[in-house]
């Protein structure tokens, strides 16, 4: 049964959504909120390319994510470095796992966070089933991924690779000030005027 009130509500929501998207495009702002997925990576990479095509002005990328699919995070990380405009990453809420990988794609001086942001670094994890030989292949791949991520975080923070490996052996939580001291964050900001 069709409900005309529901149809009318959807019609009124659509322009607001388009208007909000247009305003975000004009402000050159992208939001990564939630789990990192292939779908989110496609959306964010498309937005980065579209904003880069529109102008060379700086882009602001807000990150609030529990992490997710590492390869999708890699895609966004690499695209941030690939586009011509400067990309500022601004952490808010929590920046964890693959979300932290995306966050550190910007040069240190372009990595900011809000005061209550929490960061989580840790080893990649995964589950596999199947034949022993396939499980062995997956184990080797996750070890390679862990070593690669340790190198990325070492380069981004200035911390030695062995320290990153030790710290991320288990969940490694940092508040905003701790993340700044660790080299993840350059500045803690409280207003958009500070960006």
UniProtKB/Swiss-Prot annotation:
Keywords: Cytoplasm, Hydrolase, Protease, Serine protease. InterPro entries: ClpP, ClpP/crotonase-like_dom_sf, ClpP/TepA, ClpP_His_AS. It is found in: Cytoplasm. This is ATP-dependent Clp protease proteolytic subunit 3. Its main location: cytoplasm. It comes from Rhizobium meliloti (strain 1021). The lineage of its organism: Bacteria, Pseudomonadati, Pseudomonadota, Alphaproteobacteria, Hyphomicrobiales. The keyword Plastid does not apply. GO terms for molecular function: ATP-dependent peptidase activity; ATPase binding; serine-type endopeptidase activity.
